[in-house]
């Protein structure tokens, strides 16, 4: 069994102001994505300035935050937030939905693309290889918050999470780290290597949806579902898995469509 590192969820406290690691991980993810997007910018569109890229990152970040929070409210705990709507604003306590954030990003990309002469999938293909940086950083934030841990297990790398998080004090799968490894590291490598060569429009977006859906679906088997939802069917199907099914199907369809439709402008390769 591995010891769980005792990390205060509050990274910095200045009087009543508290800066949480969870929030800092979002900044790390957004900053890392912006840096890598800057590296690809000239190949994506030589006419784009760093200022336009910053605008894109800003609006996509708003899509992640607003969509992620509202997605969690709608998909995972609607009744609690209806009873106490002010909880919606307590983002530092966790409660963000990737699938809600994904919808928020798509809406932001659709709006931004129309204003800047880019199609939806041109922007999504450009952005997709950077998204795993934010996903990985977010999973580290979950780990520091001691939330979203896995089922009890006797594997050698099991961890006992703090009593405030897990009163049962059982050795558990560190499922946040599994997701960091798959959704962060592995997905980044797949997309970065795949996009190094010119690809037809929609192919990179399809690869993102397909592999994120597969990785998340797999980890859900060892991750404890949200207490207010539990398993939806068969004592193993979770809300996360249900939401991943359309991503997997949609990803496969986009990849098929990208390679079978009439030729279109390919996504710019990665440097």
Curated annotation (Swiss-Prot):
Annotated organism of origin: Pseudomonas fluorescens (strain Pf0-1)
GO CC term (a single one): plasma membrane
Pathway where it operates: Protein modification; lipoprotein biosynthesis (diacylglyceryl transfer)
Keyword Cell inner membrane in annotation: yes
NCBIfam families assigned: lgt
Function comment: Catalyzes the transfer of the diacylglyceryl group from phosphatidylglycerol to the sulfhydryl group of the N-terminal cysteine of a prolipoprotein, the first step in the formation of mature lipoproteins.
Membrane topology: Multi-pass membrane protein
Stated name of the protein: Phosphatidylglycerol--prolipoprotein diacylglyceryl transferase
Record EC number: 2.5.1.145
Protein family: Belongs to the Lgt family.
Binding site for a 1,2-diacyl-sn-glycero-3-phospho-(1'-sn-glycerol): 139
UniProt-listed HAMAP family: Lgt
Keyword vocabulary terms for this entry: Cell inner membrane, Cell membrane, Membrane, Transferase, Transmembrane, Transmembrane helix
